[in-house]
């Protein structure tokens, strides 16, 4: 029997994390755009829609998925390792840049606006 490529858990976790971030935004007020292909630090752009009008207000996002987040302070805060280059990239953005960390097993999305 020929050997076939194997699927990897990181692809599954990443795919599920992107899906959970996408569906955490109300479609009546936000348009979600996923970036695929070469990863330069932006996984998605979320654009605000108010009163059925586009206002060019956007959030860029980096999405990280995990099955075992390190929870601090009764589960409201997590610790997650992140590369300094990712933080620097987000800080250099001219629009709001948010780091999304997703607990894919419990379907919980944590977020940190980097410019705050």
What do the predicted segments below correspond to?
Residues 1-40, 46-116:
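Mixed-charge (Asp/Glu-Lys/Arg
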């Amino acid at each position: 029997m020929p050997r076939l490529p194997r699927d990897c858990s990181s692809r599954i976790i990443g795919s599920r994390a992107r899906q959970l971030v996408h569906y955490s935004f109300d479609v009546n007020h936000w348009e979600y755009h996923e970036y695929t292909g070469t990863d330069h630090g932006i996984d998605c752009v979320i654009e605000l829609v108010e009163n059925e009008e586009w206002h060019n207000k956007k959030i860029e996002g980096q999405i990280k998925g995990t099955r075992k987040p390190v929870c601090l302070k009764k589960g409201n805060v997590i610790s997650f390792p992140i590369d300094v280059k990712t933080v620097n990239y987000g800080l250099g953005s001219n629009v709001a840049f948010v780091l999304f960390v997703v607990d894919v097993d419990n379907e919980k999305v944590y977020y940190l606006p980097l410019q705050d």
